[in-house]
Structure formats: C-alpha cells, structure tokens
Amino acid sequence: MDTRRLLLCLCLWVACVVSKPTEKKDRVHHDPQLSEKVHDDAQNFDYDHDAFLGAEEAKTFDQLTPEESKERLGMIVSKIDLDNDGYVTEGELTAWIKKAQKKYVYDNVERQWQEFDLNQDGLVSWDEYRNVTYGTYLDDPDPDNSFNYKQMMVRDERRFKMADQDGDLIATKEEFTAFLHPEEFDYMKDIVVLETMEDIDKNGDGLIDLEEYIGDMYNHDGDANEPEWVKTEREQFVEFRDKNHDGKMDKEETKDWILPSDYDHAEAESRHLVYESDQNKDSKLTREEIVDKYDLFVGSQATDFGEALVRHDEF
C-alpha cells in the first residue's frame, strides 16, 4: 500500500481513537543538519563531503581513486550549473546541496512513481493519481466515509494544482515530489501553512486561537491536571506565537511557528565552498576550480586513507 493511501486509512482510524492524554504533536518543520560529523576542515573534509553529496553517496567516493573521483565530480558540476553558462554560483550550489540532502525524499517518490504513472509516459496526471488513490471510493462510494474521502480528495487536488507549476494538471517527477513532500519546497510553503490551519481551526474562522492550538497537541480527556509542557505551550502561544497579541494566530504567525526561518545550513556551506575554491575571487566557480579542489567537495581513497585502511582490514 502506498504512503498516501495508507495515510488516508490512518486519518479515518485516528478519528475513532482517543489520543493518549499527554501525547504532544509536533507540527514544526526544522531545517536538518547537513551532516552528523564535526565541521573542522583542519582535521578533514568529511562534513563538506556529506553536505555536497549526502552521507550515503559520500561513502562511495571514499572508495574511488583520485582520478575516478575527479571524473565523477566533473559530471556532477554539469548538473549543478542549471543555466549552462559554465559557472556554478552560490545559489546553484545551495540548490544542489539542498537536493542532495533530500535524497531520501526523492527515493521515496521513486518507489511510488511506477504505481501512479499508469500510462508509463514519465509523468503523473491528476487523473492518474486520483484513480490510484481514490479509485475504490469513486467506484463504490461508502456513505459512512464519503465526506472524509471527498474532503481529502478536494484537498489533494488543491495541493496537486499548487505543485503543478505550469498548470496542465500533469506533474513532472519534480512537481510530484513537491506534491508528496510540500514542506521541502519553498513555493509549496503556503499550502503547508493552509493545510495546518485547516487541521487546527475548529470553528472555521480562518485563525488559530489558544484553545485550538493546545487542543491540536494535547487531549484533556481523563487528565485532571495539565502536564508542565502544556503550560509551557500556553505561555509560548501568548508570548511568542501570537505576535500581535490579538488572541489568535493568522497565516503569517502560523508560518513563523511551523516553518521557522532557522539558520540555513545549505547557504552557509555553499558560501564556504565557494570561498575555499574561488581562485580568481569572482564569486562563482568554474568546473576547473571545483575539480582542482575535489578533495574538499567529494574526497577519494587518497583523502580518506585512514578509513580505506579500516575497510581493507575488514576484508
């Protein structure tokens, strides 16, 4: 069963189940770290390798010779240079790093792609997605669940149209990725905020008041006294979430809550890589400048000799 249909079943099931009294729901989407390794170029470039390639792909480069590593890096450069002008800018490098860090997202989409691309044309239309996800309901509607399914289908169609940037109701793989994982794409952030507000706003006024905010993350049922974290969340709402202190969170206040503008690790790493590699200091990188600093970007057996010895000993 694919992720979206499983989610539909879970949504219907959850509606019938009482939550644990002290269970806390976290709706905040944080910008993840680029690597679990320490960023200390004086010791090694492991952090940079993980950031540029993703942790799993970085391991494969550690097993290549320097010549093989440079050759593969050269091929990667052409993918980073989106406008094909022969230069890699900080912006292009930031976009690449963010994409590398989202590999798990793209892998998830890849696993589902064939199931939705029914006519095998390399695209997924709204009709294809709707038929796969809601086909059973459309063929034989269940009156008891019809409202839930209809509501979710309308919501999915709205999100699909938002992800579909050219408006043809046919999604490329990138657009379909934005549809399934909207929190990962800047242009989809408004729909993430809207859906969150719809989930929490019980009185339908388009805003989130204190009780709705608390009610989304905490179920009072059977609890005589509120846990300490609930009291803290009440204080957070009054002092920080509700910025204009009108007793409710609007769209912008909700966005600041669930999509905080934390430190952008990808931008910082991009600036670092350009600074270290930009030989003529024109604030952009040529293919040659990047390949010359291959040990900073991707590594090889030579730059990861200690780990290579460990792997050899294991065999």
From Swiss-Prot:
Its main location: endoplasmic reticulum. Residues 1-19 form the signal peptide. Keywords: Calcium, Endoplasmic reticulum, Glycoprotein, Golgi apparatus, Membrane, Metal-binding, Repeat, Sarcoplasmic reticulum, Secreted, Signal. Ca(2+) 2 binds at residues 117, 119, 121, 128. It is found in: Endoplasmic reticulum membrane; Golgi apparatus; Secreted; Melanosome. Residues 68-103, 104-139, 151-186, 188-223, 229-264, 265-300 form the EF-hand domain. A motif (Prevents secretion from ER) lies at residues 312-315. Ca(2+) 4 binds at residues 201, 203, 205, 212. InterPro entries: EF-hand-dom_pair (IPR011992), EF_Hand_1_Ca_BS (IPR018247), EF_hand_dom (IPR002048). Ca(2+) 6 binds at residues 278, 280, 282, 284, 289. It holds the Pfam family EF-hand_5. GO terms for molecular function: calcium ion binding. It comes from the Eukaryota. SUPFAM superfamilies: EF-hand. GO terms for cellular component: endoplasmic reticulum membrane; extracellular region; Golgi apparatus; melanosome; sarcoplasmic reticulum lumen. Belongs to the CREC family. Involved in regulation of vitamin K-dependent carboxylation of multiple N-terminal glutamate residues. Seems to inhibit gamma-carboxylase ggcx. Binds 7 calcium ions with a low affinity. This is Calumenin. It comes from Xenopus tropicalis.
